[in-house]
C-alpha cells in the first residue's frame, strides 16, 4: 500500500475529513496519513483505540514514536494521558490497550537503529522556550543525528520569515490554525514539506503543532 509515500513530494491531509478505517484488531481504527508497505510499514497514522480495545504484543522493527492526542493510552510500562510523547527504539516490543479510549499520532519505522534511547515525556509539564523568531516558542522533545522533534507554538498574528526546509519537515496541528501560501490548516491537519521546499507560515489566531524534521535524510 502506498499513501503519500514519495518523500520528495509535498503532502497534506486534513484528518477530521477522513473516515476511520478498521485495523485487523477489533476496536482499533486508523486514519492513514502516509504509508509505504503492507500491514508492517513505514507509516504515519492517527490511531483510535475504542474503550477496552487491545493490540497484541508486537516488535518495533523500525522503531515507534507516538504522541497521545486524546484519552489515555496504556502498555506494560504504564499509562500515558493526552500530551504524552513516547519513543520505543528499534527492536523493542510491547502490547497496547486503552481502558477509556484514546487517539494517538504514531510514526513507525522512521528511527535510526543507532538511536537506542527510550523517551517518555509529559509535554504539558515542559516549559516553552524561545524559538527561532519573535512570536515563536518551542518545546524540544528529541534530537538524534539529523532528526529533531519538538512542539512549536506560534503566537497570534505572527508571520515566520520565508525559509527553506533543507532536510524536509512534517507537522501536525494540535490546536489553533496554521496557514501558508498553499492553504490553511486547522486542528488535526498534517503536512509534509519535502527537502528543498520553501514556504512562509503564519497564524492569525495562534497555533500549536508537532514538528519532526531531518528524518528524510
Q: What function would you assign to each model-found segment?
A:
Residues 1-39, 101-146:
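A short, N-terminal "cap"/entry segment at the start of jelly-roll beta-barrel domains
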Residues 28, 90-114, 195-217:
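Ligand-binding loop in jelly-roll beta-barrel domains
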Residues 28-32, 39-73:
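The feature marks the first
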Residues 55, 80, 86, 154, ...:
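Fold-core signature of tandem repeat domains
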Residues 130-175, 180:
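Surface-exposed interaction/gating patches
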